[in-house]
């Protein structure tokens, strides 16, 4: 009797698990379809660099000294982040915009994403596609690996302008045993995708954008939908990057490289978020030569909210660096 009862319970729970996974799978497919239905991101508009870990989408615009724009390392982000800046910068520079591995129109392989992976990507992209020493403007969570690329190979990057770099204390945190367990769950085919979809959907993206803007009424429906689509292209395989970021695999302690950098480095911060200025000051404490420019009434995306003022700051920093050479 007891054996029969156990068998019934096992059958019930097995059936329940199967039904639950089936429901999750259907929900995943529906959200993937909804997120990409508008086709706002056209992969045919890009050129592609066949890197050893996957195809990297990029665009080349304008003429003049090379300038590489690196978007924030985030599953929702892409070179779309620079939409308000490219035309003006291209008047005096050859502007390269790149979609990082795991983002935008670039490939999203199921590997472990680390800071060093992106150091290698930036290094190889500059050497193989740009072909000469370049200036770099980099946003948010991508700032650390650009600094590490500078320290790793002094022949590839000239001047660096960072936009709201992350604070150094958080960057130094490393994965734990619990982190590895969470990463494995998020990498699982159905459950991992379902959890990713709970965290990265239209509502959560709209909320994140609202907290990133000082003037929230400037956020358009198209912006939200574009970020939503970017996060779910290629069968939602951005979940691999998401998992690695959430579990600190993309973190790296950059303190060891700051003191040996000879590059001209500047930081532009959105002053309406006090944490941005504090983080910038941390970098300046370790490397006093860093210049900081604050932009009032902006938060995480000053280059989008006040693009004219942003361009003015960029040209000042780039011209100042040229005079020092």
Q: PLM features: residue spans?
A:
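Alpha/beta-hydrolase fold catalytic core
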Residues: 1-67, 93, 319-325
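Conserved HGGG/HGGXW glycine-rich cap/lid loop of the alpha/beta-hydrolase fold
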Residues: 59-105
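Active-site loop/oxyanion-hole signature of alpha/beta-hydrolase fold enzymes
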Residues: 97-137, 303, 312
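Conserved alpha/beta-hydrolase catalytic His-Asp/Glu region
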Residues: 172, 197-257
């Amino acid at each position: 009797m007891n054996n029969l009862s156990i068998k019934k319970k096992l059958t019930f729970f097995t059936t329940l698990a199967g039904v639950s996974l089936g429901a999750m799978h259907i929900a995943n497919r529906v959200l993937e379809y909804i997120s990409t239905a508008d086709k706002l991101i056209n992969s045919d508009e890009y050129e592609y660099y066949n890197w050893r870990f996957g195809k990297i989408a990029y665009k080349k615009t304008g003429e003049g000294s090379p300038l590489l724009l690196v978007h924030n390392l985030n599953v929702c982000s892409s070179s779309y982040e620079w939409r308000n800046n490219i035309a003006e910068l291209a008047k005096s520079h050859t502007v390269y915009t790149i979609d990082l591995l795991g983002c935008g129109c670039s490939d999203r392989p199921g590997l472990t994403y680390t800071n060093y992976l992106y150091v290698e990507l930036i290094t190889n992209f500059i050497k193989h596609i740009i072909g000469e020493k370049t200036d770099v403007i980099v946003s948010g969570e991508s700032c650390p690996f650009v600094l590490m690329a500078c320290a790793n190979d002094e022949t590839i990057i000239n001047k660096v302008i960072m936009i709201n770099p992350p604070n150094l204390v958080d960057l130094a945190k490393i994965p734990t045993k619990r982190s590895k367990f969470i990463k494995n769950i998020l990498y699982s085919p159905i459950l991992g995708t379902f959890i990713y979809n709970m965290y990265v959907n239209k509502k959560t993206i709209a909320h994140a954008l609202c907290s990133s803007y000082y003037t929230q009424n400037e956020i358009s429906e198209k912006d939200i939908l574009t970020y939503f689509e970017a996060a779910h292209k290629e069968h939602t395989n951005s979940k691999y990057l998401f998992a690695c970021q959430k579990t600190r695999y993309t973190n790296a302690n950059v303190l060891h490289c700051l003191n040996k950098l000879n590059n001209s480095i500047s930081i532009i911060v959105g002053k309406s978020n006090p944490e941005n200025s504090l983080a910038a000051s941390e970098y300046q404490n370790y490397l006093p030569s860093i210049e900081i420019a604050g932009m009032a009434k902006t938060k995480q995306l000053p280059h989008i909210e006040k693009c004219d003022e942003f361009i003015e700051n960029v040209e000042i920093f780039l011209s100042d660096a040229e005079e020092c050479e």
